[in-house]
Amino acid sequence: MKLCRFLAKGRLHHGVYREGILLDEAGEAHDPEGVTWLLPFTPGKVSGVALNYADHAEELGLSRPEEPALFWKPNNSLLPHKGVVRYPKGAEYMHYEVELAVVVGRPLRRVKAKEALDYVLGYTIANDLVVRDYVSNTFRPPIRAKGRDTFGPLGPFLVVGEVEDPQNLTLRAYVNGELRQEGHTSRMLYSVAELLEYISEFMTLEPYDVILTGTPKGISRVLPGDVMRLEIQGLGALENQIGRASCRERV
């Protein structure tokens, strides 16, 4: 089931997506192009995993991590499907990252990998945007690079009960219709279940917490005006355009 939230005719709706149509609580149909999309749920904590694909580490000239390399993605960065990303004034190199996002369904603490997927509510698509200008200091990745307002597009759906194996999904990222990035979740260094075991060993995960599971190789620069379309097999497509920097927006 593909769950979503949207505004239509001045009202907030919790709906479901079926065969190209949005159905609200009353069963009324809405055109996906005629609504204002919201985040599909209200996220709790949002954690990211850096360098979880060997080919991405290699394209950056970095070593594979010996254990999952975690970071926070602050909630102020989150942006729904079709929301406009704010390009920081003066930024030299900004890029997209298509990622499978895992949504926790019930409290998770010290759970083994073989049981971890039982605690997953569903999955969605994330775009872990980065200004690489600020990934050259000693802390990787710095919040200034990844935690900016609008730098965490998420959605469009919370997909529940449809993903049989999170390690068997194809990921793709397009910029202005051109395929820029393609990978497969089977290439993760640490699987979804292994990540949940690792994180829950020292931190309680709660309902609607989100884990961004890393990106494969294929990053490239994006600029104001570009349209990013991220697709994950069975999860739909997350699309956002990059707007021009505000005169008050600073790197």
Regions found by a protein language model. Name each.
Residues 72-86, 108-109, 150-157, 217-220:
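Short catalytic-site patches enriched in acidic/histidine residues
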Residues 2-91, 96:
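Extended, compositionally biased flexible segments
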Residues 17, 33-39, 56, 64, ...:
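Catalytic-pocket segment enriched in acidic/His residues
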Residues 109-123:
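N-terminal accessory regions of nucleic-acid-interacting proteins
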Residues 55-57, 78-81, 109-112, 131-134:
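Short, well-ordered, mixed-charge alpha-helical segments that flank or form enzyme active sites
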Residues 98-100:
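Ligand-binding beta-strand-loop-alpha-helix segment within the catalytic cores
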Residues 89-92, 108-113, 158-162:
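Short helix-to-loop capping/linker segments positioned immediately adjacent to catalytic or ligand/cofactor-binding
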